Regions:
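A short helix->loop->beta-strand "cap" motif at the edges of active sites that frequently abuts
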Residues: 52, 88-90, 115-118
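Active-site-lining helix/loop region of Rossmann-like oxidoreductase modules
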Residues: 9, 17, 121, 126-170
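General beta-strand structural signal in soluble alpha/beta enzymes
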Residues: 55, 71, 94, 120-124
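Short, ordered loop/turn segments at secondary-structure junctions
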Residues: 38-40, 97-100, 126-127
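N-terminal Rossmann-like dinucleotide-binding module
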Residues: 1-46
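Beta-loop-alpha module in the N-terminal Rossmann-like domain of NAD(P)-dependent dehydrogenases
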Residues: 56-87, 99-103
Length: 170
């Protein structure tokens, strides 16, 4: 049996980590076939680095017949592309799990995966982070903050987003 085909949805910091893992031999059972991102230039640079195709649309990425698509983009990307990815026969690895806060969308994803025999894998780092936050919240008074390398626009459509996040604070 040959390598499993892997597509990446996103072209930022997290997508680069996936490409780097492949270059370091940590994903030997996978062949990176394509990258899809919002900005063409960044997508082309990441695809060149990973030795794969830079895609302009989700249809172009899915035409490469990936077995898995790793989402490393945003909640909105999951909502825009998730059902289509699963319906194509590819399973998804989702980092932006906030997309599933939308119960209607969650239902669509669950049904599509069941009908097409595909799966959704939620990155354990996100789940582990929630476990830590839950534990801290049970300890009484605690303060928490979020530090991210993603832009605040990536939080649009989530319960965390507030318009003031878009203001330049520097």
């Amino acid at each position: 049996m040959g390598k499993l085909k892997l597509g990446i949805l996103g072209n930022g910091y997290l997508a680069d980590i996936i490409v780097e893992a492949g270059l370091k031999g940590m994903l030997d059972e996978y062949e990176l076939v394509g990258v899809l991102g919002r900005t063409r230039e960044k997508t082309e640079l990441l695809a060149k680095k990973g030795g794969c195709r830079a895609c302009s649309t989700i249809d172009e990425l899915l035409a490469l017949a990936p077995d898995y698509v790793a989402e490393a983009a945003s909640v909105q990307s999951v909502k825009d592309c998730g059902v289509k990815i699963l319906a194509s026969g590819a399973s998804m690895i989702v980092l932006s799990i906030g997309a599933f806060a939308d119960k209607e969308f969650y239902g669509q994803v669950k049904e599509t995966a069941a009908v097409h025999g595909t799966r959704v894998y939620i990155a354990s780092g996100a789940v582990g982070g929630f476990d830590v936050l839950r534990t801290i919240s049970l300890m009484g008074q605690a303060e928490a903050g979020i530090r991210t390398k993603k832009g605040p626009a990536s939080l649009k459509g989530t319960p965390l987003f507030e318009e003031r996040l878009m203001e330049d604070t520097q």
